[in-house]
Amino acid sequence: MEFYLSSDCASLARYVSKVVYLEDNDIAHIYDGELHIHCSKIGSEDFSFRTVQKLELELSKIKKGPYDNFMQKEIYEQCETTKNVMRGRVDAFTNRVVLGGLENWLTELRRAKRIIMIASKASFHSCLAARPIFEELMEVPVNVELALDFVDRNCCIFRNDVCIFVSRSGETTDTINALNYCIKKEAVTIGVVNCSGSSISRFTHCGVHTNTGPEKGIATTKSYTSQYIALVMIALWMSEDLVSKIERRKEIIQALTIVPSQIKEVLELEPLIIELCDKKLKQHDTFLLLGRGYQFASALEGASKMKEISYVHSESILTNELGHRVLAVASDNPPIIAFATKDAFSPKIASCIDQIIERKGNPIIICNKGHKIWEQDKQKGNVVTLEVPQTVDCLQGILNVIPLQLISYWLAIKKDIGVDLPRDSAMSAPDI
């Protein structure tokens, strides 16, 4: 009998059909054609019993299957990948988050005087999306840094800082350089990566694996939403000892459990988005995306995807900056996509959208289902709405970014652009 050992079951899909997943403290001993699993944890039985499971990944997980492109496949996989990142970690019955990869550093992490999140590209946007909930739950300063700029500035780092490094591959050069810098400064480091054997996962003190699976498309789609959830879970876990945040934590944990099913609802917008791209968007080469609060990160990520995949100029703008000469551009009728889901800023965002409509703009509004504020304008043809399910404010960006992924994808398809390998990409096609 042959045994294969790997940190990623995707690499074994073409060789095996059954796997045994080791858990924390397991030691696998292979001798004379037999596998024995021992538990090294003190107080546990010497032998551990692990179920032999069918490798569900198989070749289908690293092939397109019924989809035309890997990007489309990976957009649709987000229902499953968001479940995977929470599996065994989020307990809706006890309202607790368990992150075994951080437990050994519990004391140091909860004593943090400052949290610094460091990343590049889409991972940087996921950090921006999670920053407000860290500030709210932890009540400490939270910085988000672009890895290259962070190193260039020789930032001040102290021993009581916690530095979180986020990367899809775990091999992003700029992020690794920033990690080495923080290690020299003796800060506590956390890695949030998809590949458990990567450089960032090995060099950080502790970490969270996103369990996203292979992402073969250049555009980051499912990794973005998985990183977003992983960071929210870290914020929930680190704030568990704060009594004043109990009710807020419960609200978020309960909302996390239904995110996968809500993503499925969002994906049902695809036929409407295809029609929208075909009739209204494909002839344009400039787009403006408006967001505020949690949704500014969604605007940044959406604009990035449209540049990267659709080859259009797209700009993300804080909604309250609309009056600073942006309305002059809006009068030229570039498509404006506004995030207007319900949160603390909804009335102000609605006011900005009204200003756009008054200037003969025809915004595309991403709003919650049942939000009737623009119903009259919709009937007049002044606006188009893409309605997504409502969730707690700090998670709404997970649902809001998916329509932008679909818009970017279908704009590229309408222009006959190869979405999996866009031109002039600074990244190589990943196989992680």
From Swiss-Prot:
Source species, domain of life: Eukaryota
CDD domains assigned: SIS_GlmS_GlmD_1 (cd05008), SIS_GlmS_GlmD_2 (cd05009)
SIS domain: residues covered: 105-244, 277-422
GO term, biological process aspect, one: UDP-N-acetylglucosamine metabolic process
Keywords tagged on the record: Repeat
InterPro entries: GlmS/AgaS_SIS, GlmS/FrlB_SIS, SIS_dom, SIS_dom_sf
Annotated GO MF terms: carbohydrate derivative binding; glutamine-fructose-6-phosphate transaminase (isomerizing) activity
Pfam family, one: SIS
Matching PANTHER family: GLUCOSAMINE--FRUCTOSE-6-PHOSPHATE AMINOTRANSFERASE, ISOMERIZING, GLUTAMINE--FRUCTOSE-6-PHOSPHATE TRANSAMINASE (ISOMERIZING)
Identification of the protein by name: Uncharacterized protein YMR085W
